[in-house]
Amino acid sequence: MAGGGGGGGGEGPRQLDQTPTWAVSTVCGVIILISIILELIIHKVGEVFERKKKKALFEALEKIKNELMVLGFISLLLTFGQNYIASICVPSRYGHAMSFCGPYDGPSEDDRKKLKKTDHAMRILYSVQRRSLADAPPVNCKKDYVALISLNALHQVHIFIFFLAVFHVIYSAITMMLGRAKIRGWKVWEQEVIHEQEMMNDPSRFRLTHETSFVREHVNSWASNKFFFYVMCFFRQILRSVRKSDYLTMRHGFISVHLAPGMKFDFQKYIKRSLEDDFKVVVGIRPELWAFVMLFLLFDVHGWYVTAVITMIPPLLTLAIGTKLQAIISYMALEIQERHAVIQGMPVVNVSDQHFWFEKPDLVLHMIHFVLFQNAFEITYFFWIWYEFGLRSCFHHHFGLIIIRVCLGVGVQFLCSYITLPLYALVTQMGSTMKRSVFDEQTSKALEQWHKKARKKNEK
């Protein structure tokens, strides 16, 4: 007895023409309302950035909107093309090669009893059954052929795209908040140096270069050995990435090279704007990063453990970048000591690109961009698998290793956002060029007038 028309429990899935109009209208209305609210929130955030003249942050927001639009197009293509994609057949020997999980025989009797204790576990069992039905070969597939991808698998990919969009916004916000929080702590030093500016320029304040706190903190007997030099730089980025003497020395060097002597200048505000300008770069998703996503999914094969190796790239690269940036600061201190000069006030550092890898400061920023993207992608991937397949799925055979990977991801996010990116924003100012784009209008006009006066003096 199949339960014909009486109770609705035995009814199969209804098509749209059999669905009540109020149900369709309600669902559409809720989705439209949520979409409008999200659009208004993004619009209001953009208005705040424009009102506060945060040009770099506004451009970063526009870039995030563009990335979300790309993800939206991907979602639309999946929706409209899912029936056509699911109808593609491939030979069985290819259809069962390089799978995410090994042969799945279903849970044992003991496991089944444990899983039934929670609703979440019941959902896992249901998803297993649903996958087995959805993965059945379609009618139009010939013998020894299987579907390229099932409708249910396409739906799961669709959910993955949604996770990418949500976590991309969340990670971008976290990165910016942590970076700004770090630089905000330097405001006290900036206010102190502004109040003491007259004293700093006092001609009576003469010292030997090796007596300055900046040189003393970076130059010691261990600095002559390359190995111990980089070991010190490695630990310095973790224990105390930027000291007061570092900030004041680089501030003095920047102003001495790029600005007029005695000019009032808020260096901390400039660094904050520079960070926002860098954020505009790291928030985007370049084509090569999409290529990395494809390679990550391609090599996430059961038993290969390639993704476990890839997971180690962000922490290692982050520590290498931080060590290099600390080494640049220490090299500048060594250069000051080698002059054996008597200085007035703060020591002046040499401003040059030669300390950076291949003399390209932007290369470091692109490496930070890659680290942040890969780390965010792996965390997103973990939560998507947890949502779709459960925490103890075949994707997580070695659960202890998964926990370590997640902890590493959280650590890298904090280290890169709170330490490495602000440190880069500071150290990159010691390059040969300065970012005119991050100055506000008033400062830019003052700089232009000063450069014109300097040019006229040189002509005379």
From Swiss-Prot:
This protein's record includes keyword Signal: no
Residues on Extracellular side: 1-21, 89-158, 311-315, 388-398
Transmembrane region(s): 22-42, 68-88, 159-179, 290-310, 316-336, 367-387, 399-419
Keywords recorded for this protein, A-Z: Calmodulin-binding, Membrane, Pathogenesis-related protein, Plant defense, Transmembrane, Transmembrane helix
GO CC, alphabetical: plasma membrane
Chain ranges on the Cytoplasmic side, renumbered to this chain: 43-67, 180-289, 337-366, 420-460
Disulphide-bonded residues: none
InterPro entries linked: Mlo (IPR004326)
Source domain of life: Eukaryota
Localization of this protein: Membrane
Claim: Transmembrane helix is one of the keywords in the record: yes
Membrane topology value: Multi-pass membrane protein
A single GO BP: protein localization to plasma membrane
Functional description taken from the UniProt entry: May be involved in modulation of pathogen defense and leaf cell death. Activity seems to be regulated by Ca(2+)-dependent calmodulin binding and seems not to require heterotrimeric G proteins.
The family this protein is said to belong to: Belongs to the MLO family.
Domain statement: The C-terminus contains a calmodulin-binding domain, which binds calmodulin in a calcium-dependent fashion.
PANTHER family attached to this UniProt entry: MLO-LIKE PROTEIN 1, MLO-LIKE PROTEIN 5-RELATED
Descriptive protein name: MLO-like protein 9
Name of the gene this protein is made from: MLO9
